[in-house]
């Protein structure tokens, strides 16, 4: 029952199409995306403020900025077309907005993979109240 509660809490705070973004993260890192990256640092999860705490948190900051540039659909709920081909994530479909959201998620998943060595468990479930420094600009 406790595990179910933890997963439910995690589901509330993740931006984007949860399943699709989580699958991309799993594919690129081998980690379960929801539990590994939700509420990590100052930017992973819902919203964000302050300075990214490390390169992993910066991936989330860049992802938030990318979502902020998407026009024509809601990146938080958009369902897009994508596939995995030879270890790569390939965004598809004809809708430019959905492709843009997919690209944001793809780039973030790759960023997590490239920065796995910076992942620090002390930033899991990090309090937003500890994110006091001035925010970087997108």
UniProtKB/Swiss-Prot annotation:
GO cellular component: extracellular region
A GO BP annotation: arachidonate secretion
Annotated S-S bridges: 42-131, 44-60, 59-111, 65-138, 66-104, 73-97, 91-102
Source domain of life: Eukaryota
This protein's UniProt keywords: Disulfide bond, Hydrolase, Lipid degradation, Lipid metabolism, Metal-binding, Secreted, Signal, Toxin
The protein's required cofactors: Ca(2+)
Subcellular location: Secreted
Signal peptide start and end residues: 1-16
EC class of the enzyme, as a word: hydrolase
InterPro entries documented for this protein: PLipase_A2, PLipase_A2_Asp_AS, PLipase_A2_dom, PLipase_A2_dom_sf, PLipase_A2_His_AS
Binding annotation for Ca(2+): 43, 45, 47, 64
MF term (GO), any: calcium-dependent phospholipase A2 activity
Tissue: Expressed by the venom gland.
Catalysed reactions, semicolon-separated: a 1,2-diacyl-sn-glycero-3-phosphocholine + H2O = a 1-acyl-sn-glycero-3-phosphocholine + a fatty acid + H(+)
Function description: Exhibits high hydrolytic activities and shows strong preference for the anionic micelles (dPPC with deoxycholate) to the zwitterionic micelles (dPPC with Triton X-100). PLA2 catalyzes the calcium-dependent hydrolysis of the 2-acyl groups in 3-sn-phosphoglycerides.
Protein name: Acidic phospholipase A2 DsM-a2/DsM-a2'
Protein species of origin: Daboia siamensis
């Amino acid at each position: 029952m406790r595990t179910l509660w933890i997963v439910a809490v995690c589901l509330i705070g993740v931006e984007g199409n949860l399943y699709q973004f989580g699958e991309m993260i799993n594919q690129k890192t081998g980690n379960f995306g929801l539990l590994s990256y939700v509420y990590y640092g100052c930017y992973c999860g819902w919203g964000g403020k302050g300075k990214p705490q490390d390169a992993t948190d910066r991936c989330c900051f860049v992802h938030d900025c990318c979502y902020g540039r998407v026009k024509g659909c809601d990146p938080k709920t958009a369902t897009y077309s994508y596939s995995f081909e030879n270890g790569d994530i390939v965004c598809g479909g004809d809708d430019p907005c959905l492709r843009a959201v997919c690209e944001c998620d793809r780039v973030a998943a790759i960023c997590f993979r490239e920065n796995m060595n910076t992942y620090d468990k002390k930033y899991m479930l990090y309090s937003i109240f500890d994110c006091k420094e001035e925010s970087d600009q997108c």
